[in-house]
């Protein structure tokens, strides 16, 4: 199922997060330097480790004005208070809140 999903969504990089050989989440990087972070039960340690791994193993794509920023960023649903808190505690800096109408 995951293989088919990844084939349908050609991310720049996609990885399953394992704990004791059991999947507990995923993360992916896209060509616009966005990071998708999907963790079943996020913790400060786990979020920090994933962000550290990304920073140590990847570089953001070159900036394209108004399309691709020169840094990585994570979009988090507004109602996901826990992940928002964990990212702030990991020294991630909030840059925007988006609204749909």
Question: For each predicted feature, which ranges?
Answer:
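Conserved beta-hairpin
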Residues: 12-25
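Conserved catalytic-core motifs of GNAT/GCN5-like acyltransferases
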Residues: 93-101
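Active-site rim helix/loop that mediates acceptor-substrate recognition in acyltransferases
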Residues: 1-12
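Conserved, charge-rich beta-strand/loop surface module that forms ligand/interface-binding patches
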Residues: 5, 23, 77
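Short glycine-/small-residue motifs
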Residues: 25-26, 32
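A short, internal acetyl-CoA/4′-phosphopantetheine-binding micro-motif in the GNAT/acyltransferase core
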Residues: 18, 32-57, 77
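Conserved acyl-CoA
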Residues: 49-71, 88-94
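Conserved beta-strand-loop-alpha-helix junction that forms the acyl-donor binding cleft
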Residues: 66-84, 101
């Amino acid at each position: 199922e995951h293989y088919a999903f990844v084939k349908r969504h050609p991310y720049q990089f996609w990885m399953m997060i394992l704990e004791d050989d059991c999947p507990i989440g995923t993360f992916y990087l896209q060509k616009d330097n966005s990071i998708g972070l999907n963790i079943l039960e996020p913790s400060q340690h786990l979020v920090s480790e994933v962000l550290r791994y990304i920073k140590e193993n990847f570089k953001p794509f070159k900036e394209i004005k108004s399309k691709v920023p020169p840094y990585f960023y994570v979009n988090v649903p507004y109602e996901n208070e826990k992940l928002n808190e964990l990212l702030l505690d990991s020294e991630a800096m909030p840059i925007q809140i988006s609204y749909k109408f």
